[in-house]
């Protein structure tokens, strides 16, 4: 039977389809460990239970190998995806899997992402095991490989004087790591192989904050104060500074995040952090000051966005802003029209659909809030969008970072459409160093219908052999503005400049 199952998996190319979803990345534990599963839907939906052949499903290819435990699944309305990342071999911090004991390994993080929180952080968190509380992002967005240490926490065991917990959630520094493969999906899909999309930088920086706030018992403050187990964690604001462009292929990225404050406002907890990213023991290359909130779900039943609940059409459709009608390009089918007049355009194009977040884009020159150009992006929301399985496993919501990435995509396409790459040999995009800010006051879930983004160009500067483009932006969900961004930054540089990444 085992041999037959191996042959079936091989013949199927490791793929399986359940209700229209590709779930070919599941792996078998037990005697068939390492072979991708080919299971009929009725068996597949028994997540975590033995199949007819007596093998349990796991979402991680290291499960059950070399004495490794098998992380569990919890069934949700969304199917799991193929595992995108595995730890680099030989790291001594990956051998201990004891819940609540540092370091936290990839096994603990798998449990945090898709199963029982207590199997990552210990029995005190068991009240969240069967809840829909926010988890650490999973699958393609699982950017915390391991947690090495937590220091500097203020605590008094047994004395619940900090909002009903015995440690101060606003203290402590966590060191975590992400092992970034050289062929990561986001590197393979970006316009060049050494360019990590800005959204992924954001996620790598912010995800450790989610682990630290949970380790610091912030969700327990809300759970115990409000007697609620289903609570949601959301980024509210951030100021980020890119200090230098770094080639992160095949690198272990170290995240140092420090909690700088925590307060409760009724049925909401607000947490602040300072984060820096480094590699190879070097100086930081990306720094973020951020704030997050813990909420009860009812807060989002009627979100009010940035404008106190008032909906609005996109900027170019507001009568007072009437002007030339933009030409609309369907993506990706008409993307070639945008790039057709650019020499070396292939080096500017995103290389995979997964790295694109828009299905339409349009531009107006010399327009927008700053009079220097305007881009509008559109996406019809699909309940099968890949990121809903990843973020979060028990609480499906589009990552704010991908909303920001949709603005970056619109900026890139605007820049090409307006000829800003003309005269640059083998042009390519890179991130412009400097400060970018964002604010989130709402969310996009599978229940929503339409995402729109606006990009308002505020600076176009030719210098140092390249072109710098800076813009402000907004994201609308069903005509409600929910995100704002300040100073989105990209550069167009000659192809040879890609060697400057160190």
PLM features: residue spans?
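Substrate-binding beta-hairpin/strand module that engages nucleic acids
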Residues: 222-232, 420-433
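Well-ordered mid-protein domain cores that form the structural environment of catalytic cofactors
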Residues: 215-218, 225, 238-243, 441
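Short tryptophan-centered beta-strand motifs in secreted/extracellular beta-sheet-rich domains
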Residues: 253-259, 451-457
